[in-house]
């Protein structure tokens, strides 16, 4: 009698399961906050030197299961999983390739992020200045600083968008960016770091929009 052989995976399957549960808990909180409407948004965590754990495309972020987190290589190709990764996987993997220290990338679609991306699309960036919460970003120890958040044009061609992000990363340090009419990407060395950057940007963008309303610009 011949035994059925299961092909070995090039990554630690138990580690993928561990990361799946870690991500699902956080994603569920974002979904409850309304930051992942209509199955939008995607999230990832470095699995090992050559692989990333990332959400499967088109899943409702309010009720993810372990099988909704899959592995891809650093070129964005599915590994050991029959499903399709997020359509924007390349925007995740480019960061993991470029920065070996990055451990987590978060992409959300909150109302605040989307409106801010539309308001500041013409300028191409949002300048956040003199906020105490700027100290939430890695490397910032004072409020007396300015953080520029880029706003990129939306496109369905992820190669073009990834190239634009890479070009700007050559010129400035970034903790996140907006895509016009779309949402926001943030990242960090750990999930906690990435989440802190996301929450800080969400709050500061809300502040900027409220200031525009108070001044009669919106």
Swiss-Prot record:
Sorted UniProt keywords: Amino-acid biosynthesis, Lyase, Metal-binding, Methionine biosynthesis, Zinc
UniProt KW Thylakoid keyword: no
Gene Ontology cellular component annotations, sorted alphabetically: cytoplasm
Class of this enzyme: lyase
Pfam families reported for this sequence: Aldolase_II (PF00596)
Cofactor binding note from Swiss-Prot or TrEMBL: Binds 1 zinc ion per subunit.
Catalytic activity from the UniProt record: 5-(methylsulfanyl)-D-ribulose 1-phosphate = 5-methylsulfanyl-2,3-dioxopentyl phosphate + H2O
E.C. number: 4.2.1.109
Cofactor or coenzyme needed: Zn(2+)
Record GO terms (molecular function): methylthioribulose 1-phosphate dehydratase activity; zinc ion binding
Residues at which Zn(2+) binds: 107, 109
Entry's Gene Ontology BP terms: L-methionine salvage from methylthioadenosine; monosaccharide metabolic process
Annotated metabolic or biological route of this protein: Amino-acid biosynthesis; L-methionine biosynthesis via salvage pathway; L-methionine from S-methyl-5-thio-alpha-D-ribose 1-phosphate: step 2/6
Function: Catalyzes the dehydration of methylthioribulose-1-phosphate (MTRu-1-P) into 2,3-diketo-5-methylthiopentyl-1-phosphate (DK-MTP-1-P).
Entry's family note: Belongs to the aldolase class II family. MtnB subfamily.
NCBIfam families: PRK09220.1, salvage_mtnB
HAMAP family reported in the protein's UniProt record: Salvage_MtnB
Name of the protein: Methylthioribulose-1-phosphate dehydratase
Native source species: Xylella fastidiosa (strain Temecula1 / ATCC 700964)
Gene: mtnB
């Amino acid at each position: 009698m011949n035994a059925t052989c299961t092909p070995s995976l090039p990554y630690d399957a138990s580690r993928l399961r561990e990361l799946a549960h870690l991500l699902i808990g956080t994603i569920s909180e974002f979904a409850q906050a309304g930051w992942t409407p209509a199955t939008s948004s995607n999230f990832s965590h470095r699995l090992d030197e050559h692989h990333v754990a990332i959400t499967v495309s088109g899943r409702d972020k309010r009720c993810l299961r372990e099988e909704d987190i899959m592995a891809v290589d650093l070129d964005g190709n599915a590994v050991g999983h029959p499903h399709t990764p997020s359509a924007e996987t390349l925007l995740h993997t480019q960061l993991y390739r470029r920065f070996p220290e990055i451990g987590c990338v978060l992409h959300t679609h909150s109302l605040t992020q989307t409106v801010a991306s539309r308001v500041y699309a013409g300028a191409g960036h949002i300048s956040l200045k003199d906020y105490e919460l700027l100290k939430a970003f890695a490397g910032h120890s004072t409020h007396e600083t300015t953080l520029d958040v880029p706003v990129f044009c939306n496109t369905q061609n992820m190669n073009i968008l990834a190239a634009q992000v890479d070009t700007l990363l050559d010129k400035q340090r970034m903790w996140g960016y907006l895509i016009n009419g779309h949402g926001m990407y943030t990242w960090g060395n750990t999930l906690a770091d990435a989440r802190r950057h996301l929450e800080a940007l969400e709050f500061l963008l809300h502040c900027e929009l409220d200031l525009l309303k108070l001044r009669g610009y919106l």
